Amino acid sequence: MATNILTKIFGSRNDRQLKQYRKSVVRINAMEAELEKLSDEALRGKTQEFKDRIAKGESLDALLPEAFAVVREGSKRVMKMRHFDVQLLGGMSLHNGKISEMGTGEGKTLTATMPVYLNALTGKGVHVVTVNDYLANRDAQWMGKLYNFLGLSVGINLPNMAREEKQAAYRADITYGTNNEYGFDYLRDNMVYEGADRVQRGLNYAIVDEVDSILIDEARTPLIISGQAEDQTDLYIAINKVVPLLQRQEGEEDIRTGEGVTKPGDFTVDEKSHQVFLTEQGHESAERILSELGLIPEGATLYDPANITLMHHLYAALRANHLYHRDQHYVVQNGEIVIVDEFTGRLMSGRRWSEGLHQAVEAKEGVAIQPENQTMASITFQNYFRLYGKLAGMTGTADTEAYEFQEIYGLETLVMPPNRPSRRDDQLDRVYKTTREKYEAAIKDIRECYERGQPVLVGTTSIENSEIIAALLDKEKLPHQVLNAKQHAREAEIIAQAGRSKVITIATNMAGRGTDIVLGGNVSKELEAVEADETLTAEQKQQQIDAIQAQWVQEHEKVKALGGLRIIATERHESRRIDNQLRGRSGRQGDPGSSRFYLSLDDSLMRIFAGDRVKAIMDRLKMPDGEAIEAGIVTRSIESAQRKVESRNFDMRKQLLEYDDVANDQRKVIYQQRNEILDAGDLSAQIASLRAGCFDDLVRQYVPVESVEEQWDIATLEKVLADDWQLNLALQQQVSAASAITDHDLLTSVQQEADRVFAAKVEQVGGENFTQFERMVLLQSIDTHWREHLSSLDYLRQGIHLRGYAQKQPKQEYKREAFELFSQLLDAVKNDVTKVLMTVKVQSSEQLEQAAEDMESRGESIANVTYMAPTETGEVETITDDETFRKKSTIPGGNVPRVGRNELCPCGSGKKYKHCHGKLA
């Protein structure tokens, strides 16, 4: 009560904000007469003038009135459309990073041109986000005329475009595209192995059309790119044949005495650390056997750059054969390897060991080797769109979700007044006892409309529902069209004509969205056909245009007199917002219209939430079959049920986000590291830091911090450094010879020797060649471990709710364990990279360059690439497309086939494409 009184005195926040904006509207309108006097050239020149003023430090807010006035004038000349004052208000709210709620037919597409133009003047790019490719294409071409007239470039970002086409689209001042494609481009940019292959150039400002659909309805499903890294099935089988030919060493050599080995062999097994190590003899045996099998050239070593992955496979096969035992660590079930939980003894179906171990066990058991289809990258829309410096959105229905927009995205919702007040009659719901009675009543209403010539739009919540209505209309011999949000371009044409007399259109909620239903139909296509007909003289064209327009006015007035577009719905949606969207299809721009919902107690929403209450009312009133209850109390009780569902869905989305926020913080760290590695000219500081950390960890296992000599295990440390790291240090001799030595002195000795050995390798081939090799090793290690980490997080997430039974807070446990997993990932990258760079044997710069290129090719060759994304209809779409991920550049200015970066350049220079014309692409 008190709130209502205060609102009446001071106005709502919405009113106060609009009052503020109206002052700017007055200023914009005052400039109109002056701008009308300018020539087209002078008006276009304003764009450069604004850019110069921004460069000198003028703010966009200061430029807003002039820029908006210029766009309005440009639109009058190019589009023959003048922005209404309410559209100026909407444009200001979008520029200020808010959500602008504007009713259907209020011209959201035209409204967006003003903030898009203003923000594009900075040169940092503006992204306009739509729900489907058809709308992106339509709006880019439609509004592109205005932007081009004002001297700004426009790009369209569509799926299946080649890499340089996408780069051109993102380089444009304004880019149109779908939410899914922007998100996938962001993920793909963080999977490339060359900085020049990235397509996006920073996320500056985005305007999201149908913002409720994209940021709320589709926000429960993350975008996921999954795929198989290089299929190496044959290699796993071949390496498995090597293992029986290697002998296990019995006993362990004591370095001081040289004794302890009872039977020399090729490898030792350390049960405690669950690791296998090749001996000096083992390296020679393995190299000989691999050479005989044709897996490595004669005379090559396991530590040659090209053979690094073989070493990895060999160790995986040795561990699979000597450390992992059937019916103890795993079972074979239905031709698959199923892991046994070592603590509970339960089978862990669907879980796989990482780093190639699972495939090695499959090769050992002779079952089919499953190529690993891993999640390569994923992100939720909430986290993607929060990356933008400024975000805004527009829709016809946002107010019911204003709290969620504020809570999740920090976006305020402003409701714009209509240009003309709505004359739509939203009638009370009619509730029937059974589905049969409901459909009979709806069909009766449709028939009556058809007979009097009034157009009808029948809204359904599902494709199944629309098919039921279509079948009933067929039975009644009533002509109709069905739209299911599948063929956007065709459906936009059909929905544009849904306002003609006697037309019955059945549509699911999203079908034809973004297209206005004009009473009397849309004649723009017919007018365009006349304009394009070159056989007609100018006079004949004008006559035909006048005739078409006169016919349309007649049809328009006839439909208005019949009551405008009739909306009939056969079910309430879970969300009030979707119901409001359906109603909003009618009564655009002050046109007449009406809407009615026909419901039954069998509808899922009624059954779950409101059925008993309404049924009790019906029973009390002793309602006969075929009679409906039509009362405000029933409509209110249904809306209360919808509020409950909305609240539950909000909680689900919020919970998804809270869990994804954990992964998102880690994703930002990994992606930032990747981008720094791609952009860095010199990686020596990063590599030195990793090396120092790695040897610090290693030495501290045998020489603890601030410990005394009696606690040191120098002999084992010396052996590990020699066997695993190829560092030969006489540490025992150093300790014996020194009168006083600390643990820190030993660590310094090891690190200095590691630095010396590494520096010698770099010097041998030159810093520049080694940097590219370092880059590939780093990227491949980060990518491999990040993908495994995503699988681990997914697995952790699936079972984390069970912690609640142990009186633990699942969310806190997830955060804690995810952090531990991430720390392990960083340690694994540090050790992997250091190990490869320390043990690689470098013969020549050519050999090293070839190894780097092989690693790049392996990293980029992902098979069975699968894209998972939500669709407008609420389903999850899965697209498998190998080509999309690997689209390469073409040389501009000619019909040249696509060329891989490591293939020879088609210009005939004999150089690799990446070192020739690839640099220009």
Curated annotation (Swiss-Prot):
Belongs to the SecA family. This is Protein translocase subunit SecA. GO terms for cellular component: cell envelope Sec protein transport complex; cytosol; plasma membrane. It comes from Albidiferax ferrireducens (strain ATCC BAA-621 / DSM 15236 / T118). Part of the Sec protein translocase complex. Interacts with the SecYEG preprotein conducting channel. Has a central role in coupling the hydrolysis of ATP to the transfer of proteins into and across the cell membrane, serving both as a receptor for the preprotein-SecB complex and as an ATP-driven molecular motor driving the stepwise translocation of polypeptide chains across the membrane. Monomer and homodimer. Part of the essential Sec protein translocation apparatus which comprises SecA, SecYEG and auxiliary proteins SecDF-YajC and YidC. NCBIfam families: PRK12904.1, secA. ATP binds at residues 87, 105-109, 516. The lineage of its organism: Bacteria, Pseudomonadati, Pseudomonadota, Betaproteobacteria, Burkholderiales.
